[in-house]
Amino acid sequence: MIAKASTISHGANAIRYSVNKEKADIVKANLLPDNISPEAMYGRMMLVQKKYAEKINKGRPLGRNVIRIEISPSEEESRGWTMDDWLRLSNEFIRVFDSIDLSGKTKRASSQHTNLKNSQYIVALHRDSQSGILHLHIDANRVDMDEKSMIAIRLARGLFWLRTSSTRNEAGYSLKK
């Protein structure tokens, strides 16, 4: 299993891609209403960011306002999975991701942990257009419902998750730097 995460400035386009891609299935909408358009999802995220703008960025909009995560289990791992299995994977990934101390990477105590579980996000299941391999896209608001801005750095630099059989933490994942 491989996953990558980064903060991005094109959140509206990322959400639109995640939700509207051909054969995409919505796995979960966290703290967002069901059956709304990608534009409405992004709009609701921006309302939360505006509400807390003074507190989180001295009133200025965040440049990179969405956390984009892609999770790709191997074809062998995910063969026969149901939508409930994909939901479990996304929930477990978010739980583990939130538990990682990132302050060493960011050099800022305020970036110690993410709080995705208490953030607006959408999880969509995609099929690779060439191989047909299934993978998840998660697009999350960088501002959680507790008024905190998460991860001011680009996470993709060197942060990858691999499922290993030798070295594991309690969730069965190791962080490769």
Each language-model region and where it sits:
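N-terminal nicking endonuclease/strand-transfer module with a His-rich metal-binding environment
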Residues: 1-177
